[in-house]
């Protein structure tokens, strides 16, 4: 779902405020003194029940809430209070409605039986009309229609086939879900439903969020179009008014949130898509006559007005219900004024409805053998899906349970021979913490607890993706204020800030789990569920992937992984591991620079320089630029031997240093700059050139006889070394590649101590001295 920025930023604070004050807006209601020309009406609504037959929670004071049997009692009590306040009213004046997601993402007690126990409970509680939520599409609308119709099936095994199902009398309205290319509402559902109360007609229009294509398996929505919410409301409200129906209620699976203080008794603001929907509808048709909207999908408290339209929502999982009351004018056929409402907790301080309890207990008995089976062990009582247990300023969106689930998917895919690199799953598919039971001093994981974590049964697909597409998918987490995000296995990444208000963070770097950088042009195998493969939750990058193969559904995969660990004698020890790490841009810049300099230092070997050498050679990073200059104030840049003095594909380089006229003792600075612009310097001291030894023998062309001292003469007047091994003259150096260290960056350089050189170091001064002395003696002899 998309939610406006103010809504997203205020969700947590306002929800807490709503809980703290008990969820109650002033209940003005109708009374026994209502005028005879008006009709009292009560609308009791729930949303996002998700098969929560016995799910317990707590209110702001810590008191227990939740459970279908308690909800039945509390709804009956609310109706009785309404009837007592309006003696002329009957139960026909009290209507029970729902705003979608009654089924799907359900605990085992309902989910294992295809949510048929939930449909039975709603039938017993007399819910008269409702709409679709995204989870009604989880297994396709035909399957939801089968559940409504109470039709048997042999598709899901014996415990489902044997369940004593019932046909639902509840009308389903879904005006903006139509068969593709038509205006016909899908699966024979209705665009609206009209109920007449004491001569006044009330219309109920059904609306589903147009985000459904991003929330549901592509195969389950391919046959439908989802029409604009506001335009559909305007269309059918006009049609209803044409039939004399002026009191109009919209049952919408569209998110909303109150932004005011419900305790003030004054008009409250409402934010979110439901508010935007009604604002647009009012602009399109100011006379649309919509008096009430029941919202859903984002599981929040809502109770406020948009114009003259009341918008309500009552959390999720049966924690609370909306109690809306008003008066209908018999003359106009409309509400006298915007209806009043209060959001009431489903408290457990009442006596639970025995009939509903019996349905739940029957369902539990049918699945007991399955859900109570111990399938594994854990090292703690709860493995949490919480991504920010320490309340850090920046939530990294990594959870210990998310790590366990994706590790399980990667493990099981590889066990099946798929040879995958990574696994990713949408966090919305993780429906509860993994709880354990203490038995024999151990934390046992049951089948039911595991199923509650991954209840959807989405097919796991092994797909091939490029590194670039993986990077795109990771970045898509940071759109829409991280409403949708991923849990990952096999890779790690760092994210940092951006200046984009709609994209607060970006992925700075990605590596595999062993630290190898992700290559954007390389293809990887990734395990994802078919929901993500269809671009679910807005992750369009996954739609670019190519299907390789499929493995078991996510529920079975998770359960079988836990069983495998138990069979191997392993206790599960899931934890957060820093797979997603936030760093500031300054931290990233420093780390990037340090890593680049380290890489240059490790790759660089420079051969030694001696006096009058013509080239400097060595190896460094391929593509790096190499420059050489004398380390003096008047240094001149050396001429490069190759274009731009760039190291070749093997990292080899050669720089022409003839122009530097190197002399012994010169300080030479070599600067290496990598292809990304990071550089460091290396310093060396030019050493003396190797001495050119004189030849031995006749005319200085042979080695002579052997063993005279340096500078002596042989019998033929030739000079020799006296060692019998003279060589032709010339400068020599010994290649002894040496690297140095540096702390330079793209904007500055620093260097280390001089680079040592080796080689022959015969003193030329001695040779010249001998020559001069000999010449002087010869001149003196001639003069004498």
Swiss-Prot record:
Organism: Listeria monocytogenes serovar 1/2a (strain ATCC BAA-679 / EGD-e)
Propeptide: 759-784
Top-level taxonomic group: Bacteria
Cellular-component GO terms for this entry: extracellular region; outer membrane-bounded periplasmic space
Name recorded for this polypeptide: Cell wall protein Lmo0130
Feature: compositional bias, Low complexity: 730-759
Sorted UniProt keywords: Cell wall, Peptidoglycan-anchor, Secreted, Signal
PANTHER family: 5'-NUCLEOTIDASE (PTHR11575:SF24), 5'-NUCLEOTIDASE-RELATED (PTHR11575)
Name of a matching Pfam family: Metallophos
